[in-house]
Design a protein with these regions (language model features):
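Amphipathic alpha-helical segments enriched in hydrophobic/aromatic and basic residues
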Residues: 19, 28-29, 50-56, 77-80, ...
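N-terminal intrinsically disordered/low-complexity leader segments
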Residues: 1-4, 103, 175-176
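Basic, helix-initiating cap at the start of DNA-binding domains
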Residues: 1-22, 26-41, 55, 62
Length: 181
């Protein structure tokens, strides 16, 4: 990993650790930068806002690639649901726990409500482009991607708040519903 990547990961790790310890709203960007051993200006070169430290979604590229690889004649909603199912099924146990921890922080932070929607727009755009690449029209692609991301976000936040189910079970249920199974 190059210097940029190491710094980026150090900032993300410092942020996630502090958010878990103190809560998102009680953690400042200066504290994140200090914990990572860099200046606050460096933090903002990597993450334009504090919310991006927590909300930047590392799964968008793999989900979009999985959607693009779905059969061209498959309905857009089903293609998105199945592409996401395939992408998320490859998560390691460590990624699952990290995702639950991160989503719990997000679910508990009142000030992130608008940030979640802004972050989801990036995911919707990536999935929309994937659907268009497989031949869907723009309006159909946008509607399908938006519907699946909204439903999946709800399911994931519910899963993060509870210890009663596994990620696999929560995803299966949500994606079955969204994909019309």
């Amino acid at each position: 990993m190059d210097r940029w990547g190491r710094t980026h990961e150090a900032l993300r790790h410092a942020g996630w650790t502090l958010f878990a310890e103190r809560g998102y709203d009680a953690t400042s960007t200066a504290e994140i930068a200090e914990r990572a051993g860099v200046s606050e200006m460096t933090l903002f070169r990597h993450f334009p806002t504090k919310e991006r430290v927590l909300l930047a979604d590392q799964f968008d590229p793999s989900m979009a690639a999985a959607v693009r690889a779905r059969p061209a004649d498959e309905h857009a909603m089903r293609a998105v649901a199945e592409g996401i199912r395939q992408s998320w099924s490859q998560m390691s146990a460590e990624d699952v726990e990290s995702t639950r921890d991160r989503l719990r922080i997000i679910a508990e932070a009142r000030t992130l409500r608008g940030g979640i929607e802004r972050n989801n727009e990036e995911t919707v755009a990536a999935l929309e482009r994937a659907l268009v690449a497989r031949g869907a029209g723009h309006p159909q692609a946008r509607v399908a991607a938006t519907a699946v991301v909204a439903g999946l976000s709800t399911a994931l936040l519910d899963w993060a708040r509870s210890d009663e189910t596994t990620l696999h079970a929560a995803l299966q249920s949500a994606l079955d519903t969204l994909g019309g199974v």
